[in-house]
Structure formats: structure tokens, C-alpha cells
From Swiss-Prot:
Its EC number is 2.5.1.18. Conjugation of reduced glutathione to a wide number of exogenous and endogenous hydrophobic electrophiles. Prevents dopaminergic CEP neuron degeneration in response to Mn(2+). One of its GO terms (biological process) is innate immune response. This is Glutathione S-transferase P. The gene is gst-1. Residues 80-202 form the GST C-terminal domain. Glutathione binds at Y7, W38, K42, Q49, V50, Q62, S63. GO terms for molecular function: glutathione transferase activity. Keywords: Transferase. Gene3D superfamilies: 1.20.1050.10, Glutaredoxin. Residues 1-78 form the GST N-terminal domain. Homodimer.
């Protein structure tokens, strides 16, 4: 099966997908389009959005649908209904945090960054820290000893917040250890080293 992932040359919504593919050593075409090219491509997309994953003849859009599709193919969706539901719940919590982050980044960065770091982020991370302790007391992955697609989303979310403020994880020790541990997974480490050489921006407006 030939895979082609289309997105901009930024982290954005595609980075957790790239992390998953890199970690599982899934071959794919990493198609990064410019904003000039996007004007021609946009009308052809199902919802006029990217990321878009071409899986053979199947076109899959929406970042959540893409990563869950890949999770099912790679054994990253839990082993029973309870685990799958927990993974989905954790993922949705991460999406809520990301929505607040992107709202600040794109709508009110200059005036909103400091209040976001001081008043919003600590509470959001504390909730995730508490939830992270559900399995194995937060010592491994989101559902304990087994990776899931939520781990890739969690790693990226923590990563971009460390770029925003280097002390972001000081109050959430389990999440901080998770981030450090996940970054040392051999395939993730290799991908991060390769990415560092390119150093793509996190967001499309150049903030971060």
C-alpha cells in the first residue's frame, strides 16, 4: 500500500502523524506544499483542508481520522473497548488543549502569550497529568505498557509547549518524564534529529 501525506512544511496538525509513521517505520511520501501551491490544491480536498492521507486509492482527511486509521493498522488503538475509549478520551483532551493553544497563537499571540502560560496552561496540564496516572501510575504510556496513537499526540503537544516556554512541564513530573522517555525511542530520536536539521516552524504564522 502506497501512502502519501500532504500538509504544509510546519508541525501543525500533521506532526503526530509523522511521528507515528516514523516510529513504526511505515514508508510514505511526505508531501509538503507551499502556501502558493495550496491555493490550487485546496478546492480538490474533501473539506478544503489538510492534512490529507492517500492510502492507495482512498483519500482520508481530518487529522483525527488519519491518526486513528493508522492506529488501527499498527496496533495502536488499545486491546479492548475500555482501552480504546480511554485513548480516545485522552486524545480529545489533548485536542481541547491544542485548540486553546492555537487560538492564542493565531489570534492573540503578543498580548495573550503571557496570560496563557500563567493562567491557562498549568490547569490544562494538571488535568492531563492526573489522567495520565490512570494506567501504571503514569510510569509508561497513556495506557500503561503499550503505546497508542494518543502517545504521539501527547508527545507533540508537550513538545510545542516546551518551545513556547521551557519550564512548561516543571509542575507535571509524570508528563515531563514521559516526554523525555518518548524522545529516546530509537526511531523517534532519529526522526527528531532529522527534523532538527530542517527546523520547520511549528505554526503557519511563524509564531514558534
Amino acid at each position: 500500500m502506497t501512502l502519501k501525506l500532504t500538509y504544509f512544511d510546519i508541525h501543525g496538525l500533521a506532526e503526530p502523524i509523522r511521528l507515528l509513521l516514523a516510529d513504526k517505520q511505515v514508508a510514505y511520501e511526505d508531501h509538503r506544499v507551499t502556501y502558493e501551491q495550496w491555493a490550487d490544491i485546496k478546492p480538490k480536498m474533501i473539506f478544503g483542508q489538510v492534512p490529507c492521507l492517500l492510502s492507495g486509492d482512498e483519500e482520508i482527511v481530518q487529522s483525527g481520522a488519519i491518526i486513528r486509521h493508522l492506529a488501527r493498522l499498527n496496533g495502536l488503538n488499545g486491546s479492548n473497548e475500555t482501552e480504546t475509549t480511554f485513548i480516545d478520551m485522552f486524545y480529545e483532551g489533548l485536542r481541547d488543549l491544542h485548540t486553546k493553544y492555537t487560538t492564542m497563537i493565531y489570534r492573540n499571540y503578543e498580548d495573550g502569550k503571557a496570560p496563557y502560560i500563567k493562567d491557562v496552561l498549568p490547569g490544562e496540564l494538571a488535568r492531563l497529568e492526573k489522567l495520565f496516572h490512570t494506567y501504571k501510575n503514569g510510569e509508561h504510556y497513556v495506557i500503561g505498557d503499550k503505546e497508542s496513537y494518543a502517545d504521539y499526540v501527547l508527545f507533540e503537544e508537550l513538545d510545542i509547549h516546551l518551545i513556547l516556554t521551557p519550564n512548561a512541564l516543571d509542575g507535571v513530573p509524570a508528563l515531563k518524564k514521559f516526554h523525555e522517555r518518548f524522545a529516546e525511542r530509537p526511531n523517534i530520536k532519529a526522526y527528531l534529529n532529522k527534523r532538527a536539521a530542517i527546523n520547520p516552524p511549528v505554526n503557519g504564522n511563524g509564531k514558534q
